[in-house]
UniProtKB/Swiss-Prot annotation:
<comment type="subunit">
    <text>Homodimer.</text>
</comment>
<feature type="binding site" description="in other chain">
    <location>
        <begin position="13"/>
        <end position="16"/>
    </location>
    <ligand>
        <name>IMP</name>
    </ligand>
</feature>
<dbReference type="InterPro" id="IPR042110">
    <property type="entry name" value="Adenylosuccinate_synth_dom2"/>
</dbReference>
<dbReference type="GO" id="GO:0005737">
    <property type="term" value="C:cytoplasm"/>
</dbReference>
<dbReference type="InterPro" id="IPR042111">
    <property type="entry name" value="Adenylosuccinate_synth_dom3"/>
</dbReference>
<keyword id="KW-0963">Cytoplasm</keyword>
<keyword id="KW-0460">Magnesium</keyword>
<feature type="binding site" description="in other chain">
    <location>
        <begin position="38"/>
        <end position="41"/>
    </location>
    <ligand>
        <name>IMP</name>
    </ligand>
</feature>
<feature type="binding site">
    <location>
        <begin position="12"/>
        <end position="18"/>
    </location>
    <ligand>
        <name>GTP</name>
    </ligand>
</feature>
<dbReference type="GO" id="GO:0004019">
    <property type="term" value="F:adenylosuccinate synthase activity"/>
</dbReference>
<protein>
    <recommendedName>
        <fullName>Adenylosuccinate synthetase</fullName>
        <ecNumber>6.3.4.4</ecNumber>
    </recommendedName>
</protein>
<keyword id="KW-0658">Purine biosynthesis</keyword>
<dbReference type="GO" id="GO:0044208">
    <property type="term" value="P:'de novo' AMP biosynthetic process"/>
</dbReference>
<dbReference type="GO" id="GO:0000287">
    <property type="term" value="F:magnesium ion binding"/>
</dbReference>
<comment type="pathway">
    <text>Purine metabolism; AMP biosynthesis via de novo pathway; AMP from IMP: step 1/2.</text>
</comment>
<feature type="binding site" description="in other chain">
    <location>
        <position position="302"/>
    </location>
    <ligand>
        <name>IMP</name>
    </ligand>
</feature>
<feature type="binding site">
    <location>
        <begin position="298"/>
        <end position="304"/>
    </location>
    <ligand>
        <name>substrate</name>
    </ligand>
</feature>
Length: 428
């Protein structure tokens, strides 16, 4: 048995899709365990660029099983569109498996997400308005509709009618907008269900059988630890658990089955949406990193907020996710910056703190304590090993590993798969 979990150690967008795609070559099963189509990952395959939001990035390999786990929330309309997107490009999806226990995102979830974000005004969370939060709310309130319900027209109609009765009161009385009619949703979404029915099964059986047979299973996290509903910058978080522990719940495998946890980080920090960001840059260096790193959201196209590498954040991620291996991405983006900074701790009211605060009020008042390192100007995009890196680049990478306490296993010097280098195997 060899299982690897890939998690983001920052606020998402660390390049998990690329690393998952890279590690997929040696995996036999690739599974997602939380989130929905709020996560976007870009994969370069055979020179073509693909953008996926729901389907695991291992879909490009016909011999590998790809799993949408029970912990995910699935927008059937978006899933059918993504399947068509792949089919139109000649990519087979016969290797896809969808959990019958995953919850379904319906039009009223999308509407609620949008209205609630508008209502909050200046206090908005910065959601992607994909209905993720409202779908997880229904799941927790035990009124959610699951994939297994979507496939049974009688059950789907009954649950949908019950939910619309409640949601329409909310739309009309609280938000002052028109609700939904049963016929607006029933036929269209039942049909989406029929289009995905052939992929639906109990995915926990698929995953546990694979692990028991000693096959290599890769679990692909979405978002990042700092967006985790329990461990992130609450309430500026997602509604699920991207931490490695989310695998046990969202994929239906026991904690004893997890062997390695790869924490993916950029060599700097980015964030989409609102919330405190201690190392954020509002200067020319920040603008330069954003442009060179093409830091615009895959899902929203929004410019990402950019800052220096924060080892307080990544140490927190290591602790709460049990990270065993570091994958450091986008080192090349920092080429040409004369002096680089790494945040080693925070200063709060004259005191040095090394743990990430739970209070956003405290966090907003924290000043980053920086260690300065000399930059490099050499082109590193063709580098294949640590030894080939310029002295300053290597020192920067090694210092990040030291400060975070995570051994370096993978580093990447460009967006292409060929620019991803293994220092030590995560499947060992």
């Amino acid at each position: 048995m060899s299982s690897v979990v890939v998690v983001g150690t920052q606020w998402g967008d660390e390049g998990k899709g690329k690393i998952t795609d890279f590690l997929s070559e040696n995996a036999e099963v690739i599974a997602r365990y939380q989130g929905g189509n709020n996560a976007g990952h870009t994969i370069v395959f055979n020179g073509e660029k693909y953008k996926l939001h729901l389907i695991p990035s291992g879909i490009f390999y016909k011999d590998k099983i790809c799993v949408i786990g029970n912990g995910m929330v699935v927008d059937p309309k978006a899933l059918v569109a993504e399947l068509k997107y792949l089919h139109d490009r000649g990519i087979s999806t016969d290797n896809l498996r969808i959990s019958n226990r995953a919850h379904v995102i319906l039009p009223y979830h999308l509407k609620l997400d949008e209205l609630e974000e508008e209502r909050k005004g200046a206090n908005k969370i910065g959601t992607t308005k994909k209905g993720i939060g409202p779908a997880y709310m229904d799941k927790a309130a035990r009124v959610g509709i699951r994939i297994v319900d979507l496939l049974d027209r009688e059950v789907f109609e009954e649950k949908l009618a019950r939910n619309l009765q409640e949601k329409n009161v909310l739309f009309e009385k609280v938000y002052g907008v028109e609700g939904f009619k049963l016929e607006d949703i029933l036929d269209e979404y039942y049909e989406y269900g029929q289009q995905i029915a052939k992929y639906v099964c109990d995915t926990s059986v698929v995953l546990n059988n694979a692990l028991d047979e000693g096959r290599r299973v890769l679990f692909e996290g979405a978002q990042g630890v700092m967006l985790d509903i329990d461990q992130g910058t609450y309430p500026f978080v997602t509604s699920s658990n991207p931490v490695a522990g989310g695998v046990t719940i969202g994929a239906g495998v026991g904690p004893t089955k997890i062997k390695h946890v790869v924490g993916v980080a950029k060599a700097y920090t980015t964030r989409v949406g609102d919330g405190p960001f201690p190392t954020e840059l509002h200067d020319e260096i920040g603008d330069r990193i954003r442009e060179v790193g093409r830091e615009y959201g895959t899902t929203t196209g929004r410019p990402r907020r950019v800052g220096w590498f924060d080892s307080v954040v990544v140490r927190h991620a290591r602790r709460v996710s049990g990270i065993t291996d570091l994958s450091l991405n986008s080192i090349d983006v920092l080429t040409g910056i004369e002096t680089l900074k790494i945040c080693v701790a925070y200063r709060y009211k004259g005191k040095v703190i090394e743990e990430f605060p739970a209070s956003l009020k405290v966090l907003a008042e924290c000043e980053p304590i920086y260690e300065e390192l000399p930059g490099w100007s050499e082109d590193i995009t063709g580098v294949k090993s640590l030894d080939e890196l310029p002295v300053n680049a290597r020192h920067y990478v090694e210092r990040i590993s030291q400060l975070t306490g995570i051994p370096l296993s993978i580093f990447s010097v460009g967006p292409d798969r060929s620019q991803t280098n293994v220092v030590r195997s995560v499947y060992a």
